Amino acid sequence: MCNKLEQVFSQLANAEISNKDNVYTIVVAKENLRQAAETLRNNDIVRFDFLRDIIGMDYTDSLGVIYNLSPSEDLSVIVLLESRTDDRENPAFDTVEDLWLSAPFYEREVHDFFGIRFLGNPDMRRIFLRQDWRGYPLRKDYDSSPIINPIPLENEDLDALEYLPVLDLKDIDKERKSVFDKGDFVVNFGPQHPATHGVLHLRVSLDGEVIKKVDPNFGYIHRGIEKICEVSMYHQILHLADRLDYLSGSINRHAVCMAIEKGIQLEVPPRAQYVRTIIDELTRIASHLLGWGAMAMDMGAITAFVYGMRDREKIMKIFEKTCGGRLMANYSMIGGLMEDIHPDFQKDIKEFVVYMRKMLREHHILFTGNPIARGRMEGVGHLTREQAISIGATGPVGRASGWQCDVRKIEPYAAYDKAEFTAVLREGGMTFDRYYIRLDEIEESLKIIEQLVDNIPEGPFCAKPKPIVKLPEGEYIQRVENARGDFSVYINSRGDKFPYRVKFRSPSMVLVNVLKHIAPGNKIADLIMLGGSLDYVIPCIDR
């Protein structure tokens, strides 16, 4: 692979290339950015067809962007494509929205928070903040005075969302075209609707009962978590990570801990590694049970939801005994675990594994084999493997389309290399495949837990870091496999006790982008079911 990468990198014009911990950093001038992106995406040697994220940066004297890229055939390879501009008044880069289907949302996010324009992107509306918001919050010189942005007393006018502005260097505010075609019948779905699974606003245009277009609107519970991280010490960031995807809180927290531990070169005791892995897999099972039950309830099967919550409650009780918390376990900390496991931890888990295997069979009998439910799910909401990669759909959604993207297999962390399990794949890419694969993953999680729970090493449960943690200057990336896919943490440190920049990669944001692509052509009655099959979590998107 190294020789192939060298061949690809040799095609880049005037690029500075470095490698640290198998992460390649490529720095190019802004006039060469588009050519570099095209080369990485379209070359015939190693195609970087997976755009994991676009990270906006304020370097004080300049503004920049970082494209986090990997080839879908070898996700262990990470390339950070960086570029900067000294023009803080009118910062602009060429768009890459035609190269990756994930790019439009990412570019809108960078524009929203940094004011960077992406020339050629036809939709440069703000994506989290109101369209009338003044300033760019993640810039270092941002003025947060409430006088500039007072608390609004009225809802945002929907007309503000209707027009797509052209963002070039000459005429910034010119209205280019409407989101929908003239005469379209548009339905507002959410943000206060139980089937959106959170405060998500979807504007849906219809031709009769058939969906023509879906326009998602985020930000109703945007909390500025990445901005808060910049004024928080590293141990404080852990509590913010829990509150992104709250159904994968322990897994997200694990990712932040590993990023920090990697930076300060702190070795975590084996006992903590095993317990972290078990907690992560219990969290995954709990999330999948809730996702399974919620999707079934969206389709009218309330009994399935009740059964899913009943089974999930057993996991919550295990968490409560050992961690003290339920949904927010607050268990992993820098160096290991907050406390050692409860004396009943292993006994309770072994009982749960036996119970859950029996219940999985019951769940399949109850709902999977139901001919009405199966008839609604099969042949609906097709997502091809190529689309999944270009949109960046990882986790169960990506694997249901035949893409092997499980971080636990690609880059084993904690104690995953001590357990044998299968990263389940399905080839259909339909709603039924996305439904079924989560039940399969519960079985694989039970296998992992079963292999580890009787082999938890003796010894300390935590390695004690310094009271005030300071990461050495540099960039740190850590990714984990949470219940919805590749959750990545990017930390840029200047050697201080506060991070200079923190970026969380939201797998749920990508899943709403999937909905935007698979919903057209389906009936409006199936929109709720399609969203349920994707299992996105809104606080993870809004951050």
Which residues does each predicted region cover?
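Terminal low-complexity/charged segments
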Residues: 1-210, 369, 373-380, 387, ...
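Active-site bordering "gate/hinge" segments
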Residues: 131, 165-197, 205-543
